[in-house]
Swiss-Prot record:
Sequence intervals crossing the membrane: 31-51, 73-93, 98-118, 135-155, 177-197, 209-229, 251-271, 273-293, 298-318, 347-367
Superkingdom of this protein's organism: Bacteria
Localization of this protein: Cell inner membrane
HAMAP family the UniProt entry points to: MraY
Gene Ontology CC terms, in alphabetical order: plasma membrane
Pathway: Cell wall biogenesis; peptidoglycan biosynthesis
GO terms, biological process: cell division; cell wall organization; peptidoglycan biosynthetic process; regulation of cell shape
Cofactors that this protein relies on: Mg(2+)
Protein's name in the database: Phospho-N-acetylmuramoyl-pentapeptide-transferase
Length: 370
């Protein structure tokens, strides 16, 4: 909104030109969402508690989790609300992909909310039927992909920088230029990325602050990548694809990072609120959508290796038990394996954060090492 008002009424005033700078608006977006989250945090927690939106605990889960029972959930409402408000204030709403990101983040959050509502209010064990949830995820992802690949993601001829590419091309880390031309397979591949990412983050959200912190680190990293990818000088210097308008995604990502750091204030151990599927589904899906916009789908395997390992641990555990009758891990997802192994919850979370920072550094290094 501020950018729109400046561009419409005040672009002749040099003193207000700062509102046109992406770096300034990104920083302000992060601070705004963070302080909105701080300000509304206790109010939202009390509101959720009053409505009996409370967490239930797995019967077969670690005994230490019994104390978490009854903690308010659906805190993802706080994250998505702060994010959208900040983007509305500081984002360039003329950038169609900012609108698309915001709308589809809200769609995934609504899907997660419906699942949480069924579990915590309707007391339906397991919440929404897995098949229904999966099909709705596919539908939302499909609409996003159609909009991006056929409308908002089309790059005008002559605006691809030093590295020419098609929007359906696939890039690999440490490799200069596109590796595969996906063509018609770009949409099903992208749907797989979004759904895989959303469910992987959902599985990671099992300890106080674990998903919040690791996603925040990934979001900050992608914000840096978005900025350099959307700036022709840096994109050409680094020999990465120049994506017109991508630097505006850094405003969206900064707002999301601010909301996550603000939420972590209340979600750190011992958690006063959980994000629930309302938060984890939309956060994972947003990571997936962002890497598609930035042509960094494969990089997410490195940057989000924690989420990948959490999802793989569940797949391996289920597969091993069905085939051999034996379990590989004490419990899946992976963080519960360490927990049952005697490692304290806070130590697991902090170690995972450290690993996430290392993965972020490696991911950023791929911009130059190729």
């Amino acid at each position: 909104m501020f950018y729109y008002l400046y561009d419409l009424y005040f672009n002749h005033l040099d003193s207000l030109r700062i509102f046109s700078y992406v770096t300034f608006r990104a920083l302000m977006a992060g601070l705004t969402s963070m302080f909105v989250t701080f300000w509304l945090g206790h109010k939202v927690i009390d509101f959720l508690y009053g409505l009996k939106f409370r967490e239930s605990v797995r019967d077969d889960g670690p005994k230490s989790h019994e104390s978490k029972k009854g903690t308010p959930t659906m805190g993802g409402l706080l994250i998505i609300g702060s994010l959208l408000l900040s983007v509305l204030l500081w984002g360039n709403l003329k950038n169609s992909n900012i609108i698309v990101l915001s709308v589809f983040a809200l769609c995934f959050s609504a899907l997660g909310f419906a699942d949480d509502y069924m579990k915590s209010v309707k007391k339906i064990k397991g919440g929404m039927k897995a098949r229904t949830k999966f099909l709705l995820s596919i539908l939302i992802s499909l609409v996003f992909c159609i909009l991006f690949f056929y409308y908002t993601g089309v790059i005008p001829t002559g605006h691809s920088g030093k590295i020419p590419f098609q929007i359906t091309d696939l890039f690999f880390p440490f490799v200069k230029g596109p590796v595969l031309a996906l063509g018609v397979f770009a949409i099903p591949f992208s749907i797989l990325v979004i759904i895989g990412s959303s469910h992987a983050v959902n599985l990671t959200d099992g300890l106080d602050g674990l998903a919040t912190g690791t996603v925040a680190i990934s979001v900050v990293t992608l914000g840096i990548i978005a900025y350099v990818s959307g700036t022709p000088i840096t994109a050409n210097y680094l020999n990465i694809p120049y994506l017109p308008g991508a630097h505006e995604y850094s405003v969206f990502l900064s707002a999301l990072a601010g909301a996550l750091f603000g939420f972590l204030w209340f979600n750190a151990h011992p958690a006063q609120v959980f994000m629930g599927d309302t938060g984890s589904l939309f956060l994972g899906a947003t990571l997936g959508m962002i890497v598609i916009l930035l042509k960094k789908e494969i990089l997410l395997l490195i940057l989000g290796a924690i989420f990948v390992s959490e999802a793989l641990s569940v797949i391996l555990q289920v597969g091993s038990f069905k085939l051999t009758g034996k379990r590989i891990f004490k419990m899946a997802p992976l963080h519960h394996h360490f927990e049952l192994g005697g490692v304290k919850e806070t130590k697991i979370v902090i170690r995972f954060w450290i690993i996430a920072v290392i993965l972020a550094i490696i991911s950023l290094s791929t911009l130059k090492i190729q």
